[in-house]
Amino acid sequence: MKKEFTGIVAGLLLATVSGVSFAENDPLVGKWKTIDDRTSYSRADVEIRKKPDGTYEGIIVETRNIPGAEKMNICHQCPGQLKNKPFIGLPFIWGFKQDPKNPLQFVQGSVLDPIGGKVYKGKARLSANGKRLTLRGYVGVSVIGRSVTWIKY
């Protein structure tokens, strides 16, 4: 009985350590500084996590003022259950899957514009060094959309 218990504990520890190691080696996981493509100011920090189903989501963890503009704290324009939720903790991107043909690309995601409240289809591409993420939100086909680049902390 003691051997079985020791084996179970060892297995759980190994699984936990393996999961932590995997997350540390996953270049998309971590904290990112968003850069507004229109003003070039950093508006927020987003924490990207890998979910148990293998998809990625990003949660807003910090917001900043743009000089001369009022700081927004609540997502008044967001749809559905996200309406009137605070920006901090708000799911901002979700459903992204790593492209099996290109591990630096992530596809089939959704992107929330927390200012306008619209949800767009999304795709993302990591730089070769894993320090920059180009995120594209679009309607229909990716030609009709806009891209932003984030910087990893």
Annotated model-derived regions:
Residues 34-122:
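Central antiparallel beta-sheet cores of small beta-barrel/beta-sandwich binding domains
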